[in-house]
Amino acid sequence: MEKVNFLTAGQSEEVALRFACDLVGKLYLISLKRDQIDLINLRCFDANQAHAIDKLLWQIPENLFIPHKLINNKDSKDCKVEISYPGIRTIKNYDFLINLNPQLPSNYRDFRETYQIVIKDESSFQEKARASYKKCLKDGIKPTYID
C-alpha cells in the first residue's frame, strides 16, 4: 500500500531545497545499507527549480556523493535519483517520490512512498499543499503530517 508523508520544510524555497537534498541523502543511505538501491524521483515545481536542486545535490549532503541527473538529460547514464518537473514524462517504476511541487502528480499512488514537501510561507503554495492533503484523504489514503 502506498504511503504519503507531508513534511514541513521551513518557510522559504531555499530552506526547502536543502531539506529535500538531505532527505534524498537519508533515503539513499538507507537503501545502500540494505544492498538494494531504491529509485527516487525528485519532482520540482518547474525547470528552474530542477536545475537549482541539481546543482545543490553536488554539495548537500556533505560527505556523500549521490548520483543524480535531470530526467530529460539523455547524455547522462541512468541514476537512482532523477529530477523531474511537470511536463516531463517519467516512465520508470520509482520507489520514492520527493515532491517539491505543492500539487501531487496524478500518478502519486504509483510510488511506494511519497514525501510531500510543505513550505510554511502562508502563500498559495501552502494552500495547494493543503489541497493535496485533502486529495489523499479523498483517495482513501491517510497521510502522515510531520511538522
What are the roles of these predicted feature ranges?
Residues 17-22, 130:
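Short amphipathic alpha-helical segment that frequently serves as the phosphate-/nucleotide-binding helix
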Residues 4-8, 37-45, 97-99, 116-117:
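Short hydrophobic beta-strand segments
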Residues 1-16:
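Glycine-rich phosphate-binding "P-loop"
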Residues 12-14, 48-51, 88-92, 103-109, ...:
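Short acidic, S/G/P-rich loop/turn micro-motifs used as interaction or catalytic elements
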Residues 74-111:
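Mid-chain, well-packed structural core segment of small domains
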Residues 64-85, 143-147:
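A generic structural motif
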